[in-house]
Amino acid sequence: MRSPYLIGVFLAAGKSRRMGQNKLALPLKGENIGSLSLKTALSSRLDHVLVVERTEHASLEWIGAPYHAPPFQKRWSLHVCQDAEKGQGHSVSSGVRKAESMGADGIVILLADQPQLSVDHLNALVALAPESFAVSSFLGAFTPPIYFSSTCFPYVKGLKGDEGARRLLKSGQLGAGAVLEAKDSGELDDIDTPEEYDMVRRAMS
């Protein structure tokens, strides 16, 4: 029996409005926010990572040379979402459609602005791999990364606008899933504002 083929859908198509500049390119721990988040995904047990961007050029601002060379080069590919401007739901559904066309048995929704996420947490989520979904949580608050099996794809592909995957979990449409509690809140924090960026820089210094 073969192992499930799992693809990470790495959401990097946001416009960073609250930051005022491309937050993924902001320096952090010798790299930048986006590359540190991507490194975690590429170092995990995921078989492949789809980087979902709004344009091909946008990815060049933060994906550095190390990710275009071994050992990372063949572990990821770029997927441009033509409707990214319409909201995150479109990026999610577009990424899942692409992953499905690549033969994915399951996908993990990942955020490009979660640089404190650990490989251990991501691997633990993948190891759960239930028949429906597995979601990360801290003190009861659900957040990416979120695993979805192929049985959930029809629902996830229906997301649009600013709808997030969490709405599906709360709707009950997907049945019972698994919850993986993070060891600390910082691991699941995303970065949207200059204040949050400063906090993460201090935490990771």
UniProtKB/Swiss-Prot annotation:
It comes from the Bacteria. SUPFAM superfamilies: Nucleotide-diphospho-sugar transferases. Induction: Expression is very low in excess nitrogen (glutamate plus ammonia) and is induced during limiting-nitrogen conditions (glutamate). Expression decreases when allantoin is added during limiting-nitrogen conditions. The keyword Mitochondrion does not apply. Pathway: Purine metabolism; hypoxanthine degradation. GO terms for molecular function: nucleotidyltransferase activity. Keywords: Purine metabolism. InterPro entries: MobA-like_NTP_Trfase, Nucleotide-diphossugar_trans, Xanthine_dehydrogenase_PucB. GO terms for biological process: hypoxanthine catabolic process. Required for xanthine dehydrogenase activity. Could be involved in formation of the molybdenum cofactor required by xanthine dehydrogenase. This is Purine catabolism protein PucB. The lineage of its organism: Bacteria, Bacillati, Bacillota, Bacilli, Bacillales. The gene is pucB.
